[in-house]
A protein has these predicted regions:
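N-terminal signal peptide c-region/cleavage motif recognized by signal peptidases
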Residues: 14-16
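Extracellular/periplasmic catalytic domains that process cell-envelope and extracellular macromolecules
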Residues: 23-25, 47-49, 103-106
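Alpha-helical segment that forms one wall of the substrate-binding/catalytic cleft
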Residues: 58-120, 129-137
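Sec-dependent signal peptide recognition
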Residues: 1-9
């Protein structure tokens, strides 16, 4: 019994999993795609620096690949399924309870996507979150 309790407590405090449900994560990612590109896989923005439905920068893609085996090349970000894997890998790295010190929210996901690993703390990402939130609320 002590071993089971220790394992449960360890999982509670050491977990890096996001607290969002799969549906909540999928919903916010869908809203981000809408805000970023209106779901256009061919979208190119930010003077050619951001591509695909999520408007992924090369540095974001490289960062996501640091702790994930997603493979591929940067231009694969034009493929929505691949781009989704990139964003999920990025969030698995940065949108964690351990990093944030609390449960991860949809707002955190949106603000980290927009502002980088510490985007959830940046006032500059609040306006972006409001856009994503509007899409979520209008669904």
């Amino acid at each position: 019994m002590i071993a089971k309790t220790t394992i449960i407590i360890s999982l509670m405090f050491c977990s890096t999993a996001m607290a969002l449900t799969d549906k909540e994560l999928t919903d916010v990612l869908t809203a981000i795609r809408t805000v970023e590109s209106n779901n256009n896989p061919s979208a190119v923005g930010d003077n050619g620096n951001a591509i695909g439905v999520y408007q992924i920068w090369k540095s974001y893609w490289k960062d996501a690949r640091q702790t994930s085996s997603i493979g591929g090349v940067y231009n694969d970000c034009f493929t929505p399924d691949y781009a989704d894997r990139v964003v999920r890998a990025y969030m698995k790295r940065y949108a964690t309870e351990k990093r944030l010190g609390r449960e991860v929210t949809q707002e955190d996901i949106a603000r980290i996507h927009n502002g980088g690993p510490n985007g959830y703390k940046k006032s500059a990402t609040v306006k972006y979150w409001k856009k994503v939130q509007k899409v979520l609320n209008d669904r």
